[in-house]
Amino acid sequence: MVGIDLNTVEEEEDEEEGGATGTVTAPAEARAGGAVCLELWHACAGPVAPLPRKGSAVVYLPQGHLEHLGAAPGSGPGAAVPPHVFCRVVDVSLHADAATDEVYAQVSLVADNEEVERRMREGEDGAACDGEGEDAVKRPARIPHMFCKTLTASDTSTHGGFSVPRRAAEDCFPPLDYSLQRPFQELVAKDLHGTEWRFRHIYRGQPRRHLLTTGWSGFINKKKLVSGDAVLFLRGEDGELRLGVRRAAQLKNASPFPALHNQISNTSSLSEVAHAVAVKSIFHIYYNPRLSQSEFIIPYWKFMRSFSQPFSVGMRFKLRYESEDASERRRTGIIIGSREADPMWHGSKWKCLVVKWDDDVECRRPNGVSPWEIELSGSVSGSHLSTPHSKRLKSCFPQVNPDIVLPNGSVSSDFAESARFHKVLQGQELLGLKTRDGTVNTASQATEARNFQYTDERSCSINMSNNILGVPRLGVKTPSGNPGFSYHCSGFGESQRFQEVLQGQEVFRPYRGGTLSDACIRGSGFRQPDGNHAPGAAFKWLAPQGCDHHGITTSVLPQASSPSSVLMFPQTSSKMPGLEYIYGCLDRNENSRHFKIGPTQDMTRTDQTLRLWPHLISGKVLDECTRNEKLHSPVSGAEHESNNKCLNTNGCKIFGISLTEKAQAGDEVDCGNASYHSRLQSLKPQMPKSLGSSCATVHEQRPVVGRVVDISAVNTMI
């Protein structure tokens, strides 16, 4: 084991080293080569291994010392030792373990709280009083003639040698005589213990390269080096070659300290520290710079300066660290908060800053740092504190029209979406909702509105390609004269299995509850011919402003056995209510829109097959161009009695095409909207050929035009 007294380095820098070889054990022998050994020790310790100087003022943090020893949080003397102990450095000596070549330092300290308190009262700066500054505690300047290489599998094999980069060989090794056919030379290098190692340096191969051959395998076996460890060579000012190692296993796995360090550095030693602090006697701290990610012996000036900086959430910082290839690098991050790392050490500033690293994947450091470890590099706005992430699908509330008001003062919207559309892309989340007083509500009321849904999901909706939806049960009123409704044509034929939609392609399911759909969607409408209503009618269609039509009623909402199968109506004795659908036809020579109305004939469900256009099922109307529906307010009692006299069961027409053999011509209604001139002409339905009188096959992914729904087995309808 080698002991190097750091305090005598400056006095003996110019002394030449003796030619002794072998392992050096006496401190005097170590001091003889102090300057070179100091460089080698720092080279093996890594680029971030600061050490205090003799006589300097430091702050000792026992909490960090416990973490350095691997003790569990909450262990140690606790209240017996203050979280920050102001000390004076009595001595610093450097050591290297004989078995592993691992470097560590022994720092002797004495508590000096009174002197520090006096300085703080007088407002003196620690660096000025000690004659110290940043340069005084820095590690020695970068050694110009040094290289470090991580060993590969071929470097550690017994058959080959150690391949040296050409630039490194020319910088560190003595020059070769390239006039020879095979240039070579003998190299002698000393390790931390003063042991000499001899290697044959040759320049050969195709292409030619520098190799260490003879003697290299013996060095690998003796030091027990493996692939991943690092070997470094440096040449001092006197031209002598030095050799050191850095073990990757100790850096990655935090292997135990060397033997001397293990004998003294344990949890019980903190009890001795507590006693030494109380009586102001000297105590010793053993410090391994490669195993400690954070310093727990801090220069006084550095400790005090860290508290003069205004740390705040959102500030960016840089932190120096040693990479696996033994080079110095900087890691960056953002401050996101503050905390006490261990409640037992109340008031401790050890790792009190909570940070977020920019390289979360590669970073193995904890999310807490100490103020004196980092260098501030700027600040960011609060909107950048969140983690950047790629666009991904997320569950979403339906995006609603903010101008539709529910009876309870909340909001509603026009919906025509299948229940299977559950996801949208990021940025398509729920918008604000507008109430009667103009205020905007958000997700809470949208959730309330979504609760107005059918109990049986199967009977209410299928995929939007089929556009078959159940009838709502609770009236929702559309404000008259509202110009905020806009409808856009959309084609049919989307697959029922399409589970996701892109931005701008969302359609939404209806709220559960409400009366039948709006009979007029900006230019189309429905009309109920004169006749008697069925008794006990519970639903009717009301005309919105600008449309002239009557309502129709039914007594009980029929149920569908399955969205993709023939609709079955279990009632046995009721007759079909009078029903008319107004098919819109545009006159190309006029800015008007005409609708043909066809009354239905009396018929029972047991002897008629009802061929329905897919957009009109069980009293529900969907706009062909928009696939949207409008909802109405509940029917008042007076309107209910008045419209109960208008039921007629003569027949049914859809888009001007009779659904029965006894279809009759109807009236014409003008709703005045020519915006869908070409669209509605192209969408004029064509009835398919008869598929028989029993049932019709429904293909879910085919276009819905001309779909036949067989209800010949229907007994009744209320």
From Swiss-Prot:
GO terms for biological process: auxin-activated signaling pathway; regulation of DNA-templated transcription. Residues 147-249 bind DNA. It is found in: Nucleus. SUPFAM superfamilies: DNA-binding pseudobarrel domain. Induction: By auxin under dark condition. The keyword DNA-binding applies. It holds the Pfam family ARF_AD. Expressed in roots, culms, leaves and young panicles. GO terms for molecular function: DNA binding. InterPro entries: ARF_dom, ARF_plant, B3_DNA-bd, DNA-bd_pseudobarrel_sf. Keywords: Auxin signaling pathway, DNA-binding, Nucleus, Transcription, Transcription regulation. Residues 1-24 are annotated as: Disordered. Residues 8-18 have a biased composition (Acidic residues). Its main location: nucleus. GO terms for cellular component: nucleus. Auxin response factors (ARFs) are transcriptional factors that bind specifically to the DNA sequence 5'-TGTCTC-3' found in the auxin-responsive promoter elements (AuxREs). Homo and heterodimers. Belongs to the ARF family. This is Auxin response factor 2. The lineage of its organism: Eukaryota, Viridiplantae, Streptophyta, Embryophyta, Tracheophyta. The gene is ARF2.
